[in-house]
């Protein structure tokens, strides 16, 4: 089922599209299937088979006040990560099964995190038996992550007690693809179905956390690319919820219509275009980084945005070169993309750190980084709290020699 296409946008069509998303995607019904692999080193783990339904009758003895101690939920530790098999129709690039992870926390505050792991768009870059430039399987396990927003013991973590949904990445398409079984020739057939897999996170929130007060959509590297799209989809589905979007380490890719169209054609990005008034007539050629912010930001002006990047991010530079944009400067493109977004009427505060490092949200540096006298974790905390934040941009940005 094609879940999206370019059509004339309207509020009614938007509602229809969101309703379709809940029922569409890959492996309908797979959300309810959990595995036995949900483990945490010190935390309790919940699975769907953990507590069978009680069977009581009216003839059972009534409990006394001393039979069981009172439960004090305020002192219980957060629950561990639960691995959920997405369903038979969800798949990684090589056809292996796709699963995502949920960590129960405060149900009124939810973080949807998209994992990174490269990209591919040619036989050479996608060949799993060669030198692939992307993660082939959904092997990342948040139980093994203990840095950045996943450092649940750090008192400075602004989302430490939130419910978290972690979407692994294994399709090489920036979580934007809807093209299953793309044939690159030479026997290389790849599932670029990252958007369809990502809809499982959307479904999880709408079905189980639809009354949340606040949802932060974020992701690092390739996981930052779909943030505006999924923030918009959630704003459409949950109009009473405050939606925040913060991509990490993905703002420095130029929007070139020719390259957008070629790569988008391989990935099937047109299948991810929502039914919004701002996307009327949009094709894959107009699915660049600043455009995604513009479509979602203008359609849903209550979404609050922010963005993090390193000024000369070496990974972003290398993938721009791989796509044929050798002359692009990451810092210059960061400035251009921010300008295009804000000129279109979408406010986008940015935090640009010096150097060539890549990502911040899953690293210990999240608590250590300070630029122009402003700590990143303080800037992030203020953003989440709804405080006004300004651009923080390095003056000595450490351009590589």
Residue ranges with predicted function:
Residues 22-25:
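C-terminal motif of bacterial Sec signal peptides marking the signal peptidase cleavage site
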Residues 34-76:
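Extracellular mucin-like PTS domains
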Residues 15-20:
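Sec-dependent N-terminal signal peptides
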Residues 3-14:
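Bacterial N-terminal signal peptides that target proteins for export
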């Amino acid at each position: 089922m094609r879940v999206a296409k370019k059509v004339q946008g309207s509020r009614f069509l938007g509602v229809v599209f969101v309703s379709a998303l809940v029922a569409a995607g890959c492996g309908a019904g797979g959300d309810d299937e959990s595995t036995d692999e949900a483990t945490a080193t010190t935390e309790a783990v919940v699975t769907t088979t953990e507590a069978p339904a009680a069977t009581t009758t009216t003839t059972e003895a009534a409990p006394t006040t001393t039979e069981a101690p009172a439960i004090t939920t305020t002192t219980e530790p957060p629950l561990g990560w639960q691995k959920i098999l997405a369903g038979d129709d969800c798949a990684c690039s090589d056809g292996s099964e796709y699963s995502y992870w949920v960590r129960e926390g405060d149900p009124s505050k939810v973080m949807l995190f998209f994992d990174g792991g490269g990209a591919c768009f040619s036989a050479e870059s996608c060949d799993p038996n060669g030198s692939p430039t992307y993660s082939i399987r959904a092997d990342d396990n948040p139980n093994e992550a203990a840095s950045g927003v996943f450092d649940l013991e750090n008192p400075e973590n602004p989302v430490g007690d939130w419910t978290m949904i972690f979407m692994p990445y294994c399709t090489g398409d920036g979580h934007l693809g809807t093209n299953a079984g793309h044939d690159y020739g030479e026997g290389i057939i790849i599932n670029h179905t990252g958007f369809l897999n990502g809809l499982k996170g959307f479904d999880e929130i709408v079905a189980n956390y639809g009354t949340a007060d606040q949802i932060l959509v974020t992701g690092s590297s390739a996981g930052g690319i779909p943030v505006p799209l999924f923030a918009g989809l959630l704003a459409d589905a949950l109009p009473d919820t405050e939606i925040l979007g913060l991509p990490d380490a993905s703002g420095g890719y130029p929007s070139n219509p020719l390259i957008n169209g070629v790569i988008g054609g391989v990935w099937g990005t047109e299948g991810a275009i929502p039914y919004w008034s701002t996307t009327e007539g949009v094709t894959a050629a107009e699915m660049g980084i600043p455009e995604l912010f513009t479509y979602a930001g203008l359609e849903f002006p209550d979404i609050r945005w922010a963005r993090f990047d390193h000024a000369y991010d070496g990974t972003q530079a290398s993938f721009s070169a791989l796509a044929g944009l050798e002359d692009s400067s990451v810092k210059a493109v960061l400035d251009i993309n921010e300008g295009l977004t804000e000129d279109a009427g979408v406010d986008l505060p940015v935090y640009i750190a010096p150097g060539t490092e890549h990502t911040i949200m899953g690293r210990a540096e999240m608590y250590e980084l300070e630029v122009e006298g402003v700590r990143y974790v303080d800037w992030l905390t203020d953003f989440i709290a709804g405080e006004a934040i300004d651009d923080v941009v390095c003056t000595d940005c450490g351009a590589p020699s």
